[in-house]
Amino acid sequence: MASHASSRIAKVLVANRGEIAVRVIRAARDARLPSVAVYAEPDAEAPHVRLADEAFALGGHTSAESYLDFGKILDAAAKSGANAIHPGYGFLAENADFAQAVIDAGLIWIGPSPQSIRDLGDKVTARHIAARAQAPLVPGTPDPVKNADEVVAFAKEHGVPIAIKAAFGGGGKGMKVARTLEEISELYESAVREATVAFGRGECFVERYLDKPRHVEAQVIADQHGNIVVAGTRDCSLQRRFQKLVEEAPAPFLTDAQRKEIHESAKRICKEAHYYGAGTVEYLVGQDGLISFLEVNTRLQVEHPVTEETTGIDLVLQQFKIANGEKLELIKDPIPCGHAIEFRINGEDAGRNFLPSPGPVSKFHPPTGPGVRLDSGVETGSVIGGQFDSMLAKLIVHGATRQEALARARRALDEFEVEGLATVIPFHRAVVSDPALIGDNNSFSVHTRWIETEWNNTIEPFIDNQPLDEEDTRPQQTVIVEVDGRRLEVSLPADLALANPAGCNPAGVIRKKPKPRKRGGHTGAATSGDAVTAPMQGTVVKVAVAEGQTVMTGDLVVVLEAMKMENPVTAHKDGIITGLAVEAGTAITQGTVLAEIK
């Protein structure tokens, strides 16, 4: 169970970072609950750390060294006196072993039961549950595949395209679509690598892929007493690399029969899985109207605000109540009021095919006004590294109708100013005026691969030539110190605070406004003359060539990873590989020469 009969949530530790940590901390404050933040070293100055009532350092620079470390998080809970843990989304939110460890430590787990997470998190088991619940399904492998040969065999039997998908995770990570038999081997290996990095397990299964489908989902809320409601639908069809960029609620252009099938099958699936908590049942809707079950996300979704804005339901507060063992106050599915659209503000360069773009945020000026909400994990002065997800914030707009929401979105996006690094705001500004998204009274034409296959990308690559800031000359400096892992802030005279030549004292680090990084005027093309260069900052996860190897134009040279996304770098001409300068695990910066082709 998520809670013990004799206990209620008294103090919440949020085992996450960024905007979702801020969201949960604010909900805790609304519920008059003290909150505890945890943070990796790169996040020591993050907003969620300051907003919480207490903050504890996890140490480490990567997810594995911090937010994925069971022991460090449970230790922080013990030190802080927190009796409940909210996992947010991503990281450990869908890790059944962590949920069980929290419960075994005598703490309240704000989420579904470990068994439900295990059953629905395993996408193969989830398909079996969906089948028992008589949910609509496309053909797929009954169990995870052992190798690429099994994937090829499935494709030969059922045809392409096929989807190779991580069995233990979601969010588009560890998912690849093969449209030819020849590319299956490479895509299978890439899916396994991504799944291993993101979820700690690399098993994958395969299913038929519906071409040009819509992505529609149902927001479920279920208590521990068997009561289940669907708080509405969402459309999340605007994606790149199978990761969502724009979401809206309620899902537009569904027939009454389709909406009924989604609501009812979502409830049947959750009942079959003995599910409680907030969760999302996802579907694909084909061009012909065919509905197919996709997966269940056993957590709060990134896009939950659009449901909140159209129902008036605070989904995080609902999670708190369910974990306390309370019954749902809702007795039937709410009727949505108005229309809401969410835009993920990612640190990616839309002008360069959405390449990850780590860097400093020298200016962050979000919009305000009627119908505008912002969920953010950054601010002016934040530094966005390549270790974590690329999302900086979420802009949510609400209107009485879909047309009004789109109009407010255009205004809000025009007001949104972010400087210092590339973001997807230029894409959002373009797409809200695109006829494919606007549609007519009956339909629109966007689908899950619309961005890659149909959108006319005329966005210029990001170039930032801002000068560096002058040195900070404030008379006071705030020093961050850690005492037994607990974060404290002390204000000291600047000359005393800067007495240490390294800019910090042995106990902590000085809070300074990060200087905007001056970027060159090049567009980050992966090639120049003979050189094959890195189009972005990241880590080499695969080297596909050897010194002296002959390659053809388009052949894979290396695979880079940044912000949890893999990006292939290919040969720009025919020739022989010389001067191969990297290996798997090498950290590189944008423009690094990886090899030459002579």
Curated annotation (Swiss-Prot):
Assigned EC number: 6.3.4.14
Feature: compositional bias, Basic residues: 510-521
Alphabetized UniProt keyword annotations: ATP-binding, Biotin, Fatty acid biosynthesis, Fatty acid metabolism, Ligase, Lipid biosynthesis, Lipid metabolism, Magnesium, Manganese, Metal-binding, Nucleotide-binding
Domain ATP-grasp, first and last residues per copy: 127-324
Region (Disordered): 506-531
UniProt binding sites for Mg(2+) 1: 282, 295
UniProt pathway annotation: Lipid metabolism; fatty acid biosynthesis; Lipid metabolism; mycolic acid biosynthesis
Cofactor names: Mg(2+); Mn(2+); biotin
Residues annotated for Mn(2+) 1 binding in this entry: 282, 295
Catalysis performed (reactions): N(6)-biotinyl-L-lysyl-[protein] + hydrogencarbonate + ATP = N(6)-carboxybiotinyl-L-lysyl-[protein] + ADP + phosphate + H(+)
An individual GO BP term: fatty acid biosynthetic process
Domain of life: Bacteria
Cysteine-cysteine disulfides: none
Residues the record lists as binding Mg(2+) 2: 295, 297
Function of the protein: Component of a biotin-dependent acyl-CoA carboxylase complex. This subunit catalyzes the ATP-dependent carboxylation of the biotin carried by the biotin carboxyl carrier (BCC) domain, resulting in the formation of carboxyl biotin.
The name this protein goes by in its record: Biotin-dependent acyl-coenzyme A carboxylase alpha3 subunit
Gene this protein is translated from: bccA
